[in-house]
């Protein structure tokens, strides 16, 4: 039964591990205990006795008697089992503890079916003898657990048991540590459980001890042995009949518990295999288990981030008031998708993405691909960050996106098209082919009945006569109308006589009443030459103020003045040509010879186009009066054809010249305006030139002042040098006089021939000094030694050569800054 006991101990250990939450530790302790690790010397002696008992052990069949339910064991096993009872008496039986855990504890503690501590399990396994198992146990794979009951002497004294219990409570501290994890013992709970089991054993199930201190067995252990079909009995005696009823109840209860144990065994087998692998590779050193914290995703900074100084208010963790004012849509709390949190997420994403590589342009498209939200809001946020230099500030200008525009087409040629009768407004361009001027002159000749202009004027006169003078039936009526012509002009005609379009009317219909033009009554042909001169003079003086012009004339109204001015011909055909008025040659074309230069030369009929243009600038009523005047002129010319005269119409020539001059006077204000503009331009130009001339003189004066200031400074410096030289001369002269007087005194005091060598040397030295002072007089300078003292470093060496020392002379920028400014310029 060695394998069976080993499995049973493993089951006890695994169940106990479920109670304390240390499955791996308890299984490792169990494996270490089975491997033969003993805690005390007593355990070593017991293991030696087990080996000796196994040698003499005989096979005992494990048979079950249904009637007596007794289990027999060989007599050779009794001493070994009795010796092991001392170690097992401090703990209750395995089956009793399991029953107590099942029926006396909560459901959460139902996994700990054996109620033993880890130390007791390991000790029981170490002290349990090896008992062979039968083939039935191996087939059913059920552990045969030996029941260890409490040991009592013949007098019923349990003092020895308490001593052993106290000793055993101290032993868990010496248990083996596997994989560096220390077991945690629970002496309080185990002691409580053992006390309860001992009380139940003493009251109910007192075992009977044979004279040789062998246990006949107790009820609970026997019931467990019957349930597992394999057990160990302490004596070959039978179970008392008084306990059969309790035995049957316990068997039924333990079967339900065994089912739970079987389900836990499958799980424990897997844990056992894992722990066996760990136990093989376990080291005696304690290992520490450390929790690995998840690594934070941080990217080291690889670029220097630069933002403009005016954006130092920006902070990634806060929202500034500038942002609230620039993008208020995120801070109104009206739109759920636009909140300050969403704004910070958008903003920080753009800023962080840009700062990963500040040399690359961060576009709006990149933000839209990675951030979900309003595209317009993202665009405004991107524009705001770019404006303040928070993004795209370090990007090279060559990498910035450029506006894609179509190529320029200014060099393309274009062709202008216009409707007929219109012309493009462009500068003068002479036509390639000149028109037929003779034909044009013939068309403009009003004296020729075949000309187009004559026909047009005649037709206009006919229509006008039909409107103003309807035909009458009798001559009397005509006479009355002629007498009362002024009255007819002021009334509206309601005549239904036939007019030019009367044929278009049906019977019973009348044409609309025609209104007479009131301006016709203002026409006055009684203009004298003095009145015309006053009119032209008034136009020259007052221009278009016709009230003043009429006042200047005196006896005419403003309307009459206007009509008379319009009746004046602009050009006269007698002013040009040979004076015969025919204009057959080219010299008689007059202004028409310049027709190709007019802007109407490209039209089909330039004459009519010119007339239409000029007529459009005048009041229609005025045009009508001018037409009437032209018709009257044509009739007078026709009547004069019969009277051929060789004399030239001098009066007409004079009148034409006056008209031309008056027209020029009328248009003089236009030329005056142009001249006034030209005068203003010339005046401004003259003022500008005078100002430039004045500025040039002032600049020249400033230069002269600077030059005079420089000369003054130079003169002051020369005066200072002269004064220094005078002082130096006086000083040197006094020194020379002193030396000379000293030499003379020496010579006079003693005769040179009789003097000693020392006196001669002194005289010689004084003479040499006198020579040196005469040859090289002392000079004052601006250096460190201005008076050339012998003990101070000077600019001369011992050989008399001057040495330039830069430290002796100050630079010009320090000594005279005003001169340095002029020289540097």
UniProtKB/Swiss-Prot annotation:
Residues 195-206 have a biased composition (Acidic residues). The modification Phosphoserine is found at residues 88, 185, 657. Keywords: Activator, DNA-binding, Nucleus, Phosphoprotein, Transcription, Transcription regulation. Changing residue 387 to D: Loss of DNA-binding. Residues 159-169, 180-194, 240-280 have a biased composition (Basic and acidic residues). Residues 522-573 form the SANT domain. One of its GO terms (cellular component) is nucleus. PROSITE patterns: SANT, SWIRM. GO terms for molecular function: DNA binding; histone binding. Residues 1-285, 464-509 are annotated as: Disordered. One of its GO terms (biological process) is regulation of transcription by RNA polymerase II. Residues 22-42 have a biased composition (Low complexity). It comes from the Eukaryota. Changing residue 392 to A: Loss of DNA-binding. Involved in transcriptional activation. Component of the SWI/SNF complex, an ATP-dependent chromatin-remodeling complex, which is required for the positive and negative regulation of gene expression of a large number of genes. It changes chromatin structure by altering DNA-histone contacts within a nucleosome, leading eventually to a change in nucleosome position, thus facilitating or repressing binding of gene-specific transcription factors. Present with 3150 molecules/cell in log phase SD medium. Interacts with RTT102, SWP82 and the N-terminus of SNF2. Component of the SWI/SNF global transcription activator complex. The 1.14 MDa SWI/SNF complex is composed of 11 different subunits: one copy each of SWI1, SNF2/SWI2, SNF5, SNF12/SWP73, ARP7/SWP61, ARP9/SWP59; two copies each of SWI3, SNF6, SNF11, SWP82; and three copies of TAF14/SWP29. This is SWI/SNF complex subunit SWI3. It comes from Saccharomyces cerevisiae (strain ATCC 204508 / S288c).
């Amino acid at each position: 039964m060695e394998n069976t006991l080993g499995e049973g101990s493993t089951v006890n250990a695994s169940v106990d591990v479920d109670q304390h939450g240390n499955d791996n530790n308890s299984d490792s302790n169990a494996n270490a205990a089975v491997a033969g690790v003993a805690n005390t010397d007593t355990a070593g002696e017991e293991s030696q006795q087990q080996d000796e008992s196994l040698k003499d052990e005989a096979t005992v069949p494990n048979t079950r008697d249904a009637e007596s339910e007794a289990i027999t064991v060989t007599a050779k096993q009794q001493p070994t089992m009795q010796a092991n009872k001392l170690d097992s008496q401090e703990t209750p039986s395995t089956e009793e503890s399991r029953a107590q855990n099942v029926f006396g504890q909560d459901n959460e503690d139902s996994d700990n079916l054996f109620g033993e501590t880890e130390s007791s399990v390991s000790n029981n396994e170490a002290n349990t003898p090896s008992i062979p198992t039968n083939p039935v146990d191996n087939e059913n794979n059920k552990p045969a657990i030996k029941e260890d009951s409490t040991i009592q002497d013949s007098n019923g004294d349990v003092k020895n048991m308490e001593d052993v219990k106290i000793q055993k409570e101290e032993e868990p501290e010496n248990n083996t540590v596997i994989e560096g994890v220390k077991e945690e013992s629970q002496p309080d709970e185990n002691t409580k459980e053992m006390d309860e089991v001992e009380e139940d054993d003493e009251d109910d199930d007192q075992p009977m001890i044979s004279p040789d201190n062998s246990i006949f067995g107790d009820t609970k252990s026997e019931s467990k042995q019957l349930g597992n079909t394999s057990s160990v009995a302490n004596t070959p005696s039978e179970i008392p009949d008084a306990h059969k009823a309790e035995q049957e109840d316990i068997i039924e209860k333990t079967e339900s518990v065994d089912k739970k144990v079987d389900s836990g065994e499958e799980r424990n087998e897997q844990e056992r295999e894992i722990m066996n692998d760990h136990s093989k590779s376990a080291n005696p050193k304690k290992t520490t288990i450390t929790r690995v914290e998840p690594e934070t995703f941080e990217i080291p900074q690889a670029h220097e981030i630069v933002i403009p100084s005016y954006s130092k208010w920006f902070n990634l963790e806060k929202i500034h008031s500038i942002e609230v004012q620039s993008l208020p849509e995120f801070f109104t709390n009206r739109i759920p998708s636009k909140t300050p949190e969403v704004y910070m997420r958008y903003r920080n994403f753009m800023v962080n993405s840009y700062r990963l590589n500040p040399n690359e342009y961060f576009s709006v498209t990149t933000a839209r691909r990675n951030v979900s939200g309003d595209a317009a809001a993202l665009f405004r946020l991107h524009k705001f960050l770019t404006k303040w230099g928070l993004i795209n500030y370090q990007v090279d200008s060559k990498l910035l996106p450029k506006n894609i525009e179509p190529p320029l087409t200014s060099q393309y040629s274009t062709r202008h098209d216009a409707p007929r009768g219109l012309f493009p407004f462009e500068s003068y361009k002479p036509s390639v082919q000149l028109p037929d001027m003779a034909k044009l002159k013939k068309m403009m000749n009003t004296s020729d009945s075949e000309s187009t202009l004559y026909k047009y004027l005649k037709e206009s006169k006919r229509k006008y006569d039909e409107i103003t003078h309807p035909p009458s039936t009798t001559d009397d009526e005509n006479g009355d109308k002629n007498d009362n012509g002024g009255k007819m002009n002021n009334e509206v005609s309601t005549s239904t006589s036939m007019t030019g379009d009367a044929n278009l009317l049906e019977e019973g219909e009348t044409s609309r009443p025609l209104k007479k033009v009131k301006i016709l009554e203002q026409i006055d042909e009684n203009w004298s030459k003095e009145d015309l001169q006053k009119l032209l003079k008034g136009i020259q003086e007052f221009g278009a103020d016709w009230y003043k012009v009429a006042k200047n004339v005196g006896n005419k109204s403003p309307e009459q003045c206007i009509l008379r001015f319009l009746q004046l011909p602009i050009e006269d055909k007698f002013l040009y040509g040979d004076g015969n008025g025919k204009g057959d040659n080219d010299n008689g074309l007059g202004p028409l010879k310049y027709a190709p230069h007019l802007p109407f030369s490209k039209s089909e009929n330039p004459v009519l186009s010119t007339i239409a243009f000029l007529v459009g600038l005048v009041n229609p009523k005025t045009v009508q009066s001018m037409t009437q005047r032209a018709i009257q002129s044509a009739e007078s010319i026709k009547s004069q054809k019969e009277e051929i005269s060789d004399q030239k119409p001098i009066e007409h020539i004079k009148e034409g010249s006056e008209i031309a001059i008056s027209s020029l006077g009328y248009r003089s204000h236009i030329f005056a305006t142009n001249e006034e503009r030209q005068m203003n331009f010339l005046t401004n130009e003259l003022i500008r030139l005078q100002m430039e001339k004045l500025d040039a003189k002032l600049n020249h004066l400033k230069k002269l002042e600077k030059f005079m200031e420089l000369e003054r400074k130079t003169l002051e410096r020369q005066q200072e040098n002269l004064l220094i030289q005078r002082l130096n001369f006086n000083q040197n002269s006094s020194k020379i006089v002193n030396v000379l007087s000293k030499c003379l005194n020496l010579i006079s005091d003693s005769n040179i021939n009789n003097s000693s060598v020392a006196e001669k040397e002194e005289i010689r030295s004084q003479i040499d000094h006198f020579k040196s002072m005469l040859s090289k007089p002392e000079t004052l300078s601006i250096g460190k030694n201005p008076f050339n003292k012998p003990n101070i470093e000077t600019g001369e060496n011992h050989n008399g050569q001057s040495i330039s020392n830069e430290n002796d002379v100050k630079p010009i920028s320090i000594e005279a800054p005003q001169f340095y400014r002029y020289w540097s310029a």
